[in-house]
Amino acid sequence: MTYLTLKPRFVALLSAIALVLGGCQSLNNKPDDSLYQQLGEREGIANVVEDLLYLIVDDERINQQFKGMDVAQFHHNLTDQLCELSGGPCTYTGREMRELHSDMAITNTQFNALAENLILAMEQNDIPTGAQNRLIKQLLPLYPDIRNL
């Protein structure tokens, strides 16, 4: 066999392998839910959010921003949002972040205070540090919309 007859066969073989592997990949196309698992699934996330709410109430830096809010709705929406961001089966159906925060004039200090409280709430619920970092990484893209930058 010559080089010219091997080349088309080699290309055909590589194409077939790529199709098979591509097909296998699409069969396993579910999102990575390992973070969701590490957060304790929906129940664990709901516990973190509940503890976060208590921390917000006690935090003079931010509690005025949350005055008058529907606590049950906030709990439900934030739980859904964290569940979805962590790869869980939930779907966040609340308002868009930019719209929701447009009239709040949130400062860096307030944003950081909420982040600190979220970390404290996760620590209170024995969430591993690696999972905490992964969740914070998922939340970072929301920063410009929350701050209305």
Residue ranges and their predicted role:
Residues 32-35, 39-80, 124, 130, ...:
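Post-signal-peptide N-terminal segment of Sec-exported extracytoplasmic proteins
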Residues 20-23:
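C-terminal motif of bacterial Sec signal peptides marking the signal peptidase cleavage site
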Residues 25-28:
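Bacterial signal peptide processing site
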Residues 30, 34, 57, 61, ...:
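Residue-level signal for pocket-adjacent positions within structured domains
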Residues 71-74, 78-143:
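Compact alpha-helical subdomains of small soluble proteins
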Residues 2-14:
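Bacterial N-terminal signal peptides that target proteins for export
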Residues 61-62, 91, 142-149:
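Secretory-pathway/luminal and periplasmic proteins that interact with or process carbohydrate-rich
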